[in-house]
A protein has these predicted regions:
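PLD/PLD-like phosphodiesterase catalytic module centered on the HKD motif
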Residues: 1-153
Length: 153
């Protein structure tokens, strides 16, 4: 079984609390054999994303992922904002939908594959993305990372 994940890089996110929680667990996930790809701050699909959401654009867009998309065995898909964490599970502030349809699952899988294309992501195991991040952002992630946030992340 292969599990591939595409998520936000530190460069592509403004949610430093969530990133710090993920960052604390990243090595464990890699050690388990997961393939982790992190979204670039300037993906090749940037113009497509801008055009798609132009009406929502109020300032310089941050190219981050928020929706969670999952395809299992090519025929079952999940799309939602649910974070697969205790906070989302217990406070019920997120939503998601499970779809059992091959054609829809295939379309979602193609969108995920596009996000994972090399021009849109970094390989979390191979790249040194921190060179693209300012000192203050690194410091904030480090500080968030030492707080006991595990129960809610």
């Amino acid at each position: 079984m292969t599990i591939s994940i595409v998520t936000n890089s530190l460069s592509s996110t403004d949610n430093l609390q969530a990133y710090s929680g993920y960052n604390n667990q990243k090595q464990r996930l890699l050690d388990l054999g997961l393939k982790i790809f992190e979204f670039k701050p300037n993906p090749a699909i940037a113009q497509t994303l801008i055009d798609r959401y132009r009406s929502m654009e109020k300032s310089v867009p941050i190219f981050a992922l928020h929706a969670k998309s999952l395809v299992v065995d090519g025929e079952t898909a999940f799309i939602g904002t649910f974070n697969f964490d205790p906070r989302s599970a217990h406070l019920n502030t997120e939503a998601g939908i499970v779809i059992h349809d091959y054609d829809i699952a295939r379309q979602i899988e193609q969108a995920i594959q596009q996000d994972m294309a090399s021009e849109n992501r970094w390989n979390a195991m191979e790249s040194d993305q921190l060179q693209n991040v300012g000192f203050m952002k690194k410091l904030k992630v480090m500080l968030w990372g030492i707080l006991p946030l595990e129960p809610i992340l």
